[in-house]
Amino acid sequence: MAHFTLLRTDFVEPPSTWLEAHVACIRPQGSVLDVAAGKGRNARWLAQQGFRVEAVDRDAEAMQAMRDIDGITLQVADLEQHGWPYADHQFDAIVVCRYLHRPLFPHLIDSLAPDGVLIYETFMQGQEVYGKPSNPDFLLKPDELLEAFQPALEILAFEQGPQESPKPCMLQRMVGRKRRS
């Protein structure tokens, strides 16, 4: 008898626990940009909380999982090859989880409204022990988010180091509020 394994392509991971812990920093019903949104684990949850979400990712197929969800606008864009499509936009919050492209850092700041919040979480050096990503280009150095976003942002929360959930990894996490000019 043959055994088959079905791969669920519609499965969406739960939202980032870091995002869940700091969502109260975002203006209620505000506009949120979810960078590298994928299938929308964070965008879906944010929309359910009443936020107006713009989800951007280069993978149009993955983003199709969100096409019929109220409160989410989809933008297919390769941010590494074709630049930043939000030069004329400002958001109440920008969420970046498990994605790193350092040339975007200044654009993230510019696209935050005054008092807007950046919630960032991605892998850092030491992740090589746990698996991918292991390429140093995709791993933050210790304190790199702090160095990249101060003084433009007031740092509200920061942590770095090993995380056990949902699976062991090495993360750097930051929440920062854009200072008024």
Predicted region positions:
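Core SAM-dependent methyltransferase catalytic element
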Residues: 163-181
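Conserved class I S-adenosyl-L-methionine
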Residues: 30-38
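Helix-to-beta-strand junctions that scaffold the AdoMet/dcAdoMet cofactor pocket
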Residues: 112-114
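A short acidic, Gly/Pro-enriched loop at the edge of an enzyme's catalytic core
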Residues: 84-93
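Conserved SAM/SAH-binding beta-strand->alpha-helix loop
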Residues: 59-61
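S-adenosyl-L-methionine
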Residues: 1-27
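Conserved beta-strand signature within the Rossmann-like core of class I S-adenosyl-L-methionine
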Residues: 116-123
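Conserved SAM-binding strand-loop segment of SAM-dependent methyltransferases
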Residues: 70-82
